[in-house]
Amino acid sequence: MRLERLNYNKIKIFLTLDDLTDRGLTKEDLWKDSFKVHQLFKDMMNEANTELGFEANGPIAVEVYSLQAQGMVVIVTKNQDADSEDDEYDDDYIEMQVKLDESADIIYQFHSFEDIIQLSESLQRIGITGGTVYHYDGQYFLSLEDLGSHTAEGVVAVLAEYGNPTTLTIYRLQEYGKLIMDGNAVETIQTHFS
């Protein structure tokens, strides 16, 4: 579980599939109202309080984004007036609005373009030639949409050898990142860099 403070009232939590499995949960379980899900949320809020000083007092909004074969991104936003209204809420009660979204893209982050060149050889060997490469905040990102007949888990296993899953969405990369290669990145890299 990775935590990141986005601003005073908002945090982002990245849960890997291993984090969920360790707690006996699947991605599908998160959409259910169960004791395990409540315990996971309580653990996340306790860790956010310990690591970031983020106290979830009062009403909060929870946005859950499912990243295909990578895990989940949970964005928690507390009401800006929550600190002044602490008396109105019971300690064990948190009012939540939940927004759910699932991304079809698999996005991985790489420290150098050389990592993507090496990865592209492995991807082309298994028949994947598409993909889009972005540069953002000193890092490279590869987004894959069409996996052909391959399972997302199989492709993620190859991607994980060269890079790391990211919590950035495709929308952020499209808006703020620099587009390096569009559509057939793996094939283009193999043509020009092998």
Curated annotation (Swiss-Prot):
Disulfide-linked positions: none
Top-rank taxon: Bacteria
Keywords noted in UniProt: Competence, Sporulation
GO MF annotation: an example: protein-macromolecule adaptor activity
Cross-referenced InterPro entries: MecA_C_sf, Neg-reg_MecA
Xref: Pfam families: MecA
Nucleus found in the keyword field: no
One GO BP: negative regulation of sporulation resulting in formation of a cellular spore
Function: Enables the recognition and targeting of unfolded and aggregated proteins to the ClpC protease or to other proteins involved in proteolysis. Also involved in Spx degradation by ClpC. Acts negatively in the development of competence by binding ComK and recruiting it to the ClpCP protease. When overexpressed, inhibits sporulation.
PANTHER family: ADAPTER PROTEIN MECA, ADAPTER PROTEIN MECA 2
Family membership: Belongs to the MecA family.
Domain observations: The N-terminal domain has binding sites for ComK and probably for unfolded/aggregated proteins; the C-terminal domain interacts with ClpC.
Subunit record text: Homodimer.
Protein name (database record): Adapter protein MecA 2
Native source species: Bacillus subtilis (strain 168)
